[in-house]
Design a protein with these regions (language model features):
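Conserved beta-strand signature within the Rossmann-like core of class I S-adenosyl-L-methionine
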Residues: 171-181
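Conserved class I S-adenosyl-L-methionine
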Residues: 73-82
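Conserved SAM-binding loop of SAM-dependent methyltransferases across substrates and taxa
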Residues: 83-95
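S-adenosyl-L-methionine
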Residues: 109-139
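Conserved SAM/SAH-binding beta-strand->alpha-helix loop
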Residues: 106
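Active-site capping/gating segments
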Residues: 184-219
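Class I SAM-dependent methyltransferase Rossmann-like catalytic core
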Residues: 34-70
């Protein structure tokens, strides 16, 4: 796949992004403790943007990875990758780094991803602008989408905007979404979606579910 050039934006997942945490020095960001520290400091700066105080667990990551649709030539697009807990799980689960495109709006976290996962295409930008961010190079090549953005915290119109952006780059594919809600984090029918819980794990903090949402028109 040809390198995809990101166009960074000033927009945020929820609102203003708040002050950015300093990136760990030397090799600290490449360790689990270093990545967790970056994540925690970002949570302190903007709790609503993060959705959780700690990165996703290996247990949740393995369930997300198991639910990803695999195809020989399809790319996997991850939105809101944070410091890469789910990214790592998908690689362990057999998704080649060259098939992964991850989007992260926080520059410090995007840099951690680049350092930690060589071979993965890391785009620092706004997931609501996916068509502009990915450009024509990814057209028709996205086979699966994983969303880690805490959509339950967003108003309906913002949720719809993100869903429309996903549909624009991966028509009819839908997306996987992991959430800490007991029930569906999205009002699926209001958003033109069909929702199904794919997995649940109590081994995450907090306990988490993996949902698959597909466009009603695609069923």
């Amino acid at each position: 796949m040809q390198p995809i050039r990101a166009r960074a934006t000033s927009a945020d997942h929820t609102a203003a992004s708040g002050p950015c945490p300093a990136l760990p020095q030397s090799g600290q960001a490449s360790t689990a403790a270093g990545r967790a520290w970056v994540f925690f400091k970002r949570w302190l700066a903007n709790p609503l943007q993060m959705g959780s105080i700690v990165p996703s667990s290996d247990a949740l990551g393995s369930r997300v990875a198991a639910a990803v649709h695999r195809s020989p030539d399809g790319m996997v697009l991850e939105l809101g990758a944070g410091t890469g807990a789910i990214t790592a799980a998908m690689i362990r689960g057999g998704v080649g780094p060259e098939r992964l495109i991850v989007v992260e709006i926080v520059p410090e976290m995007a840099e951690v991803l680049r350092r930690t996962y060589p071979g993965v295409t890391v785009l620092c930008g706004d997931a609501w602008e996916l068509p502009q961010l990915l450009g024509l190079q990814a057209a028709g090549r996205i086979g699966s989408v994983v969303c880690g953005i805490p959509m339950v915290l967003l108003p309906l119109e913002r949720q719809q905007g993100l869903i429309d952006a996903i549909e624009a780059v991966a028509p009819g594919r839908g997306f996987l979404h992991y959430s800490y809600c007991v029930t569906s984090p999205l009002s699926a029918h209001k958003l033109g979606l069909q929702g199904k819980r794919e997995a649940w794990t109590p081994a995450n903090f907090p306990p988490a579910s993996v949902w698959r949402y597909t466009p009603l028109a695609a069923r």
